[in-house]
A protein has these predicted regions:
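PRPP-associated nucleotide enzymes
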Residues: 1-310
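Positively charged, low-complexity/disordered segments
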Residues: 310-325
Length: 325
């Protein structure tokens, strides 16, 4: 883009599929970034075009492994050293978000550490979606634009025109999120009370509420091994639910998740494309968040341009009317 005051969008390796759709929505080309991998496992990044004085948006979800976070940090560092005006990290899925507090002695708080790493690397702003805990925004010393997948999930659910709908939360911790959907549709809220034997293993689960002859929609922020959500679906079906489907923001779907979903009572499970889903499961559907992120980038850039123009006007006026001019 030739305008000196324009923005540029670049993508890490793992999120290129989404960055291309964001750029298509914005009507701009995806910037040229090269990731070089070395034989010892290290890698480096380089911008193949000038970004001096530009606002740079770096798209990269920090999943499925730590290489994606490291790649993002290197992108930020390279942008800072190349004299970018503002560096905005666009992280649709923020990994390590489940490590947001000390739930037992002598454990790390991974979410705070990752926030510190991004800040020290040099970001001026973060755009993300559906953090596991809203308070993670406070871990950053820079502005955080926290988006919600409900922007694409709600219209999809409306298009289904489900009668006798009930919104369900797979655990007590997610009740606030699920209640937002229940209020929007004006329908009852059902809770699942679960106990875990260990991480990713549900020991027992009870339903709080009536699901008999209802079309149940389970709402969650992410699905990892799918143990909780498939167990909830099976129990609700046994309790007389007409249909059970699930909607979640982030498609982590690790380990046996795809097989569990395929063999469960779920009609379908709907995700956004914050994370690429490369496995095969007939019940998985992904909705794109590209337009939502593109609009956020557009608004962030509009505000940035307003501040820049205002600053230039003030500088010009002071220079023009200075008695020392």
């Amino acid at each position: 883009m030739s305008d000196k005051n324009s923005f540029l969008v670049f993508s890490g390796t793992n999120s290129r599929y989404l960055a291309e759709k964001i750029c298509a929505s914005l009507g701009c080309p995806l910037g040229n970034l090269v990731v070089t991998k070395f034989s010892d496992g290290e890698f480096g990044v380089s911008f193949e075009e000038s970004i001096r004085g530009r606002d740079v948006f770096l798209v990269q979800s920090t999943f499925p492994n730590s290489d994606n976070l490291m790649e993002l940090l290197l992108m930020i560092d390279a942008a800072k050293r190349a004299s970018a005006r503002n560096i905005i990290a666009v992280v649709p899925y923020f990994g390590w978000a489940r490590q947001d507090r000390k739930d037992k002695p002598r454990v790390s708080i991974g979410a705070k550490l990752v926030a510190d790493l991004l800040s020290v690397a040099g970001i001026d702003r973060l755009i993300t979606m559906d953090l596991h805990a809203d308070q993670i925004q406070g871990f950053f010393d820079v502005p955080v634009d926290h988006l919600y997948a409900s922007g694409v999930i709600l219209p999809y659910l409306q298009s289904l025109r489900l009668k006798d709908m009930v919104i369900a939360s797979p655990d007590v911790g997610g009740s606030k999120r699920a209640n937002t959907y229940a209020k929007y549709f004006g329908c009852p809220l059902v809770l699942c009370n679960k106990t875990r034997a260990r991480a990713n293993v549900v020991a027992s689960m009870q339903i709080i509420g009536d699901v008999k002859d209802k079309n149940v929609v389970i709402i969650d922020d992410m699905v990892d091994t799918a143990g909780t959500i498939t167990k909830a679906a099976d129990i609700m079906k046994q309790a007389g639910a007409k249909t059970v489907r699930a909607c979640a923001s982030h498609c982590v779907m690790s380990g046996p998740a795809s097989e569990r979903v395929q063999n469960s009572a779920l009609e379908e499970i709907v995700f956004t494309d914050s994370i690429p889903y490369t496995k095969r499961c007939d019940k998985v559907k992904q909705l794109t968040i590209a337009d939502m992120f593109a609009e956020t980038i557009r608004r962030v850039e509009d505000r940035s341009e307003e501040r820049r123009v205002g600053k230039e006007c003030r500088t010009t006026c002071r220079s023009r009317w200075s008695p020392y001019h």
